[in-house]
UniProtKB/Swiss-Prot annotation:
<feature type="binding site">
    <location>
        <position position="184"/>
    </location>
    <ligand>
        <name>L-histidine</name>
    </ligand>
</feature>
<dbReference type="InterPro" id="IPR033656">
    <property type="entry name" value="HisRS_anticodon"/>
</dbReference>
<protein>
    <recommendedName>
        <fullName>Histidine--tRNA ligase</fullName>
        <ecNumber>6.1.1.21</ecNumber>
    </recommendedName>
</protein>
<dbReference type="Pfam" id="PF13393">
    <property type="entry name" value="tRNA-synt_His"/>
</dbReference>
<dbReference type="InterPro" id="IPR036621">
    <property type="entry name" value="Anticodon-bd_dom_sf"/>
</dbReference>
<keyword id="KW-0436">Ligase</keyword>
<dbReference type="GO" id="GO:0003723">
    <property type="term" value="F:RNA binding"/>
</dbReference>
<dbReference type="GO" id="GO:0032543">
    <property type="term" value="P:mitochondrial translation"/>
</dbReference>
<feature type="binding site">
    <location>
        <position position="180"/>
    </location>
    <ligand>
        <name>L-histidine</name>
    </ligand>
</feature>
<comment type="function">
    <text>Involved in protein synthesis. Catalyzes the specific attachment of an amino acid to its cognate tRNA in a 2 step reaction: the amino acid (AA) is first activated by ATP to form AA-AMP and then transferred to the acceptor end of the tRNA. Required for germ cell development.</text>
</comment>
<dbReference type="InterPro" id="IPR015807">
    <property type="entry name" value="His-tRNA-ligase"/>
</dbReference>
<dbReference type="GO" id="GO:0005829">
    <property type="term" value="C:cytosol"/>
</dbReference>
<dbReference type="InterPro" id="IPR004154">
    <property type="entry name" value="Anticodon-bd"/>
</dbReference>
<dbReference type="InterPro" id="IPR041715">
    <property type="entry name" value="HisRS-like_core"/>
</dbReference>
<dbReference type="GO" id="GO:0006427">
    <property type="term" value="P:histidyl-tRNA aminoacylation"/>
</dbReference>
<dbReference type="GO" id="GO:0002119">
    <property type="term" value="P:nematode larval development"/>
</dbReference>
<dbReference type="GO" id="GO:0006412">
    <property type="term" value="P:translation"/>
</dbReference>
Length: 521
């Protein structure tokens, strides 16, 4: 009886609560909160690669993974030409090549890229064995290779793909899977000679690739540490403040200063002093590199700082070597502050801010609505302590440079004015009549055996006009035409595909004639 009364009472209370609903109090911020939640949901969907309305259950969207792309014949041909130029340049500087696994032990990569870089490493799913991650760059695997094989002296290059969980912007060559081309010098050498080699390669290679105007920013870790010290910034805050300073190439000083004050708790006095130093190039744009370093050395506090003095003297030696080499694209930039999780000396970065001027993507925007730019196309520096992270007894000083080949490719693709050939075919063998497929094949075999790149139509009786059109579309320089009468006379017609001029050549002189004609083109 008691239980029945209690149940009825509880039901009456619930009914009353549902009938008389409490008045909703709307906060002024509720609308903003809803917008923030919607924006967050949209950001998560974008991160997951979703676009538009959600797909129906079970429907498969055929596409490449976010931050990756396919390369068709034209793009592959252009990229291969870039890689060939890179390889030839590296070989000219006496480098050997190595290859390392696409994935490394997770412990090899962790702790080498700082807090932000570490978040971008792709971890592989644990299969009950070793914990593995995809390589983030080629430098740390190279240091692991040196330590593991007890190598103390090598000049090496490596061209391979790396992987980063970055926010991709395809139109400016920013991907999650991309090629890096690294050149490094490991070993005990005299001051700044390896750095001069690395910067010489950057200058030579970017000039050859014709990406437009570029310059190479140059700084030194010790100079940065000296500037921070005289600004009253504790050594423990070095890396976190450097991450703010490094934004000066894209962000006004006022915004960077507010970030350091509001988020990193520097005082106005500290940021004021630091701002004068890191913007020294901007405030003294009429001075050359040596003059700029000399003027900074004359500042009362900075000129007496031991770290600054050592870094400045080393850069002066490097700049003098570059002057001897005729490298004029290097620019001393006190605000350059990248890669400081393992760089110990000189640091440098090549940028091409006007590379996309006059191209179709010049005024385009990325997915976040920001203007599309290319960013750095090469970067590097000295990293004397990286090998020691793997072997405490190893003392292998290193310096090097890494080229972002996808960014260079994006520039060249945007600037490309002439269609690039997708094959290397030199000769196309055509027939003017039917039933000559065997004779065409004999000619193709003869030419290929002589080392001449040759094609023919893979049809028994192709039309002559169709064969000529194919050769013209593929920009094959020469065509060899055979007919019944030519075969009886032991001759062929050698045709210039561009000019359409033809000459009759004896069959036993064909190889020599083809080689001479190709050499004259």
């Amino acid at each position: 009886m008691f239980r029945t009364i209690t149940s009825r009472l509880a039901f009456s209370v619930r009914q009353a609560e549902e009938t008389v609903k409490p008045r909703i109090a709307y906060a002024q911020r509720s609308g903003r909160r809803i917008k923030e939640k919607v924006a967050l949901m949209q950001a998560k969907r974008k991160e997951a690669g979703e676009t538009g309305a959600p797909e129906k259950p079970g429907k498969f969207v055929l596409k490449t993974g976010k931050g990756t792309r396919d390369y068709g014949p034209a793009q592959s041909a252009l990229r291969n030409s870039v890689l060939q130029t890179v390889t030839e340049t590296f070989n000219r500087y006496g480098a050997e090549t190595i290859d390392t696994p696409v994935f490394e032990l997770r412990d090899v990569l962790m702790g080498k890229y700082g807090e932000e870089g570490g978040k971008l490493v792709y971890d592989l799913q644990d299969q009950g064995g070793e914990l593995l991650s995809l390589r983030y760059d080629l430098t740390v695997p190279f240091a692991r290779y040196l330590a593991m094989n007890k190598i103390t002296n090598i000049t090496r290059y490596q061209i391979a793909k790396v992987y980063r969980r970055d926010q991709p912007v395809m139109s400016r060559g920013r991907y999650r899977e991309f090629y890096q081309c690294d050149f490094d010098i490991a070993g005990q050498y005299d001051l700044m000679l390896p750095e001069a080699e690395c910067l010489g390669i950057v200058d030579e290679l970017l000039t050859k690739l014709e990406i437009g105007e570029f310059f190479i920013n140059l700084n030194h870790r010790l100079i940065l540490e000296g500037m921070f010290a005289v600004s009253g910034i504790p050594a423990k805050d070095f890396k976190t403040i450097c991450s703010s300073v490094d934004k000066l190439d894209k962000t006004p000083w006022e915004d960077v200063e507010q970030e350091m004050i509001n988020e990193k708790f520097l005082t106005k006095e500290q940021t004021g002093k630091l701002g004068e130093l890191v913007r020294f190039r901007e405030l003294n744009s009429d001075l050359n590199n040596l003059e700029l370093l000399e003027k900074m050395s004359q500042l009362p506090d900075l000129g007496q700082n031991d770290k600054f003095k050592k870094g400045a003297e080393e850069l002066k030696v490097l700049i003098e070597y570059l002057n001897v080499d005729g490298v004029t694209t290097v620019r001393y930039e006190p605000s350059l502050a990248r890669g400081l999780d393992y760089y110990t000396g000189a640091i440098y970065e090549a940028v091409a801010p006007k590379a996309l001027e006059g191209t179709a993507v010049e005024n385009s925007e990325d997915t976040a609505g920001q203007p599309v730019g290319v960013g750095s196309v090469a970067a590097g520096g000295r990293y004397d302590g990286l090998v020691k992270m793997f072997d405490s007894k190893a003392n292998v000083p290193c310096c090097g440079v890494s080229f972002g080949i996808e960014r260079l490719f994006a520039i060249m693709e945007a600037r490309q004015k002439v269609a690039i050939r997708t094959t290397q075919t030199e000769v196309y063998v055509a027939s003017a009549q039917k039933n000559l497929v065997r004779d065409r094949k004999k000619l193709v075999k003869m030419l290929r055996s002589a080392g001449i790149k040759t094609e023919m139509a893979l049809k028994a009786n192709p039309k002559l006009l169709t064969q000529f059109q194919y050769a013209e579309e593929r920009r094959i320089p020469l065509a060899i035409v055979i007919g019944e009468q030519e075969l009886k006379d032991g001759v062929v017609k050698l045709r210039n595909v561009v000019t359409r001029d033809e000459q009759t050549i004896k069959l036993d002189q064909l190889i020599t004639a083809v080689r001479d004609t190709l050499a004259a083109l």
